Amino acid sequence: APGEQEDIHGEPFVGRAGKLLDKILTAIDRSRGDDVYICNVLKCRPPNNRDPLPSEVEQCESYLHMQIKLIQPKLIVALGRVAGKTLLGLDVQLKEMRNETYEYTGIPLRVTYHPAALLRNSNFKAAAWDDFKWIRSFLEKN
C-alpha cells in the first residue's frame, strides 16, 4: 500500500523505503523504469499506515492482476507479507513464503522482505540480500 510520500507524489516507493529499494536494485544491476516495474497491491493509502484490510485488498486486487497481465514480467517479486499473501492466496508468515519459487498465472514469483521492514529491522537485511542475489541470478539466466 502507498505510504504518505507515495500518496503525495502519486508514485510507488518514493519515500525512505523507495530509496533503499533503488539502492538494492542498483546493487543487482537493475533500475526502475528500464527493467523494473513497481506497483502496489493497494492503490490508496490506508489510514495511519496500517496494514490493508482484506476488504480493501479485495477492492484493488483486480487492478493488480490487470497490471501484471499487461506487463507480462519475467519475474514477479512480492515485497512483503501483504503482497505475498495477496498473490499466493496464502495466510502464512513471510519467512514461510521466502526461498521458494511460486507461479502466478504462469509467471515465476518470489517473496522477500518489504524495504520498510528492512529499515525497521536490520536483522532481515542479510536474508533480503540473499533473495535479491537470487533475483539477479534468475534474471541473468532468463
Segments from the language model and where they lie:
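A polyanion-binding, active-site-adjacent surface
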Residues: 1-142
